[in-house]
């Protein structure tokens, strides 16, 4: 199972930020730096984006599974989710399923 790349900043409750189409986690670094006093911010690169793995398979079901695997791998129990555009749909579908 391949894991998504992320940059983790700060301390506190985990906040996972999921970027939009053609973006990557670095797009949110400036905002993340303003949240690090209150949150452990995870700037996630979705599959086929940034430094995460590339795959011929690419759909929302798989991106939700990738996010779930990421949360399990990092042993996160309760998370805050923030998604933009494609990342917004990914986190909404994740919230419905899990």
Residue ranges and their predicted role:
Residues 77-98:
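Conserved hydrolase catalytic core segment
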Residues 42-82:
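Active-site loop/oxyanion-hole signature of alpha/beta-hydrolase fold enzymes
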Residues 1-3:
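N-terminal cap/lid segment of alpha/beta-hydrolase-fold proteins
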């Amino acid at each position: 199972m391949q894991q998504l790349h992320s940059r983790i900043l700060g301390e506190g409750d985990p906040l996972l930020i999921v970027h939009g189409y053609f973006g990557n986690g670095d797009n949110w670094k400036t905002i993340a730096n303003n949240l690090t006093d209150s949150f452990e911010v995870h700037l996630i690169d979705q599959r086929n984006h940034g430094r995460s793995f590339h795959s011929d398979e690419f759909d929302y079901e798989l991106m939700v599974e990738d996010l779930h695997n990421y949360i399990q791998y990092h042993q996160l129990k309760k998370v805050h989710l923030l998604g933009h555009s494609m990342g917004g749909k990914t986190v909404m579908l994740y919230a419905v399923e899990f």
